[in-house]
Amino acid sequence: QWAIFLRNHDELTLEMVTDAERDYMYEEYARDPVARLNLGIRRRLAPLLDGDRRRIELMKALLLSLPGSPVLYYGDEIGMGDNIYLGDRNGVRTPMQWTGGWNGAFSTADPERLYQPLISNPVYGYQAVNVESQRRQENSLLSWTKRLIQVRRSTRVFGRGSIEFLRPANHRVLAYVRSLGAEKVLVVNNLSGTAQAVE
């Protein structure tokens, strides 16, 4: 099986799409030209989706329910942000945010000696978004992600099953059946920003 991922340490490349599709992607996900690199977008998952918890959960649900070996980029399990003002691709390669303490508990070195500076903005900074604080919250993104991973691990069909895409009349809904032997799981994803009817 192939590895599948939502984001990684490189830019989201748009070199294989049409100019119109690239313009749409820039308008939706990289209005600030600083977020663009070459023909791509250099953002982590959470800021790419404007920190919208529902959209982040949807993307992870897709990642963990579709065929392939899912790969989470470090920090995406907690909704870690980026620093697009660092050069090249370094904005998505900042230190892991373990705690809200010194250097996010990534290192005991002086902050200026770190290879990359920690994210320090109020929305995604290590004081606001870190593993330690999310471990204590049952409804945190980290806890939600761990539960979803457990569902995937305990449901064999997600790891090895076939997939059959359904064609609901409502095009805002992506539905498919994962099957392995007698085991079948119906997966229904609402791709819109509002509640949707599905048959």
Residue ranges and their predicted role:
Residues 1-199:
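Active-site and adjacent substrate-binding regions of carbohydrate-active enzymes
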